[in-house]
């Protein structure tokens, strides 16, 4: 099993419920164990699309036997099951799931970058990672 940190975010619909539903779907996968979830933080949207609702964000510490691409496929499947429609980059979404850190892996492919390249630009992600690291 590999220690992984997942970013979760939502700014459409019942944001809290969307995040908890995504966590429930993660827990239903026998190859994923959700260890801990950070405090939910309300944040301004990032990126060029400014006229959209506030986000609710969290970071989850998980362990998985899935390799990075398999985990990414599971996250995309959960987003799809929860009704996410990808219309515009940086636009509003009912759920967003990102692999932030996957063990000590470094991957730089068009569809997967680990560690997530925006960690340093997202204080809410840094706060969630610090919170979870403090509990270990």
Where are these regions (language model features)?
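Solvent-exposed residues in well-ordered beta-strands and their adjoining turns
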Residues: 9, 63-65
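N-terminal beta1-alpha1 ligand-phosphate binding loop
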Residues: 1-32, 37-44
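Flexible, gly/pro- and Lys/Arg-enriched active-site loops
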Residues: 14, 31, 46-55, 66-136
């Amino acid at each position: 099993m590999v220690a992984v940190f997942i970013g979760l975010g939502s700014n459409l619909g019942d944001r809290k419920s969307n995040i908890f539903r995504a966590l429930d779907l993660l827990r239903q996968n026998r190859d994923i164990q959700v260890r801990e979830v950070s405090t939910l933080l309300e944040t301004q949207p990032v990126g060029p699309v400014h006229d959209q609702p506030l986000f609710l964000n969290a970071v989850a510490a998980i362990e998985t036997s899935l390799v990075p691409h398999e985990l990414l496929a599971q996250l995309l499947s959960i987003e799809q099951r929860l009704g996410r429609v990808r219309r515009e980059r940086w636009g509003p979404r009912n759920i967003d799931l990102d692999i932030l850190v996957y063990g000590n892996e470094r991957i730089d492919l068009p569809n997967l970058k680990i560690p997530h390249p925006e960690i340093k630009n997202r204080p809410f992600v840094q706060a969630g990672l610090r919170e979870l690291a403090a509990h270990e």
